[in-house]
Amino acid sequence: MKKVLITGGSGLLGQYINLIAPKRLSIVTTFRNNPGNCKEFPSSKIDILNANQLENIIQNVKPAVVIHTAAVTNPIPKKNQPPKEYFNTNVTATKNIAELCAQYNSKLVYVSTDLVYAGYRGSFLKEDAKLIPATLYAETKLIGEQKVKEFTDNYLIIRTALLYGIGLNHSRCHFQDMLNNLRNKRPVKLFVDQFRTPISLTDASEIIVNLASTDHKGEILNLGGVERISRSDLGEILCSLGGFDKNLLQKITMDDIPNFPKVEDVSLNIEKLQALGFKPRTIQENISEILATNSRI
């Protein structure tokens, strides 16, 4: 089997990739602080901001593929969080990884975001749609994409849509908090005016691993679900399938949140992905599975 090195292995998406990748690939996964499920696999604690540590692990592992998920992902910086944290991780470390992948002949699978697109150019955006990131997070992810293309030819850039599911160990996501609140009969505020094409953590990680195991390269791919919906719509589906009280859903607009970056529609066209044979499941199918396998959060 091909050997793969995973960055951000203790993150929300990384832990799912850890679970799925061994079916197809020989993995070494990495973490910086909390290991999450990395301890269950061949793993190493590294700081991707340390160029020497990065080179040492790539030199020692000699991966055929590097799946780069590590990132600073907060859409809005936390209080007193300096912008340089975004640039150091999302740009500089990504550039270093791309250079090392070129040096050691490793394919780089770079996980980016749907938020690099302009949020006012229509629905079901193709990969060549206009790019106007509205947040520091999205801006640095886009610069990261540019660094990948600048320093290596053997790459795949995967722009992921909103991820939903149940975070493993210490990781969490908005969907998980929504489910927990509804189960405990607590109200949930949800946007009615932001549209995306959500994809489950399970489907996203399966597709990323499958793409990593192929020789496909030199391309940008949208990775999302087939349905364009708002977070409010997602909450409605969850209530219907889980038997929760829809009156707990409090519909709000982005204008209701001071200083919130207004990204109205970054729903993704996934025809290129589908042409490669990938077919994400519907939201109803995924949520039904989540409810069946996670009776308690």
Regions found by a protein language model. Name each.
Residues 84, 88, 92-96, 116-158, ...:
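Catalytic helix-loop patch of NAD(P)-dependent Rossmann-fold dehydrogenases
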Residues 48-89, 100:
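NAD(P)H-binding glycine-rich loop region in Rossmannoid oxidoreductase-like domains
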Residues 2-24:
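N-terminal Rossmann NAD(P)H-binding glycine-rich loop of SDR-like oxidoreductase domains
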Residues 230-236, 252-297:
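Conserved C-terminal active-site "lid" loop/helix of NAD(P)H-dependent oxidoreductases
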Residues 207, 214-258:
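Mid/C-terminal beta-alpha module of Rossmann-like enzyme folds, strongest
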Residues 7, 30, 66-70, 108-114, ...:
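SDR active-site strand-loop-helix element
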Residues 146-196, 210:
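NAD(P)-dependent short-chain dehydrogenase/reductase
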Residues 38-50:
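Rossmann-fold cofactor-recognition segment
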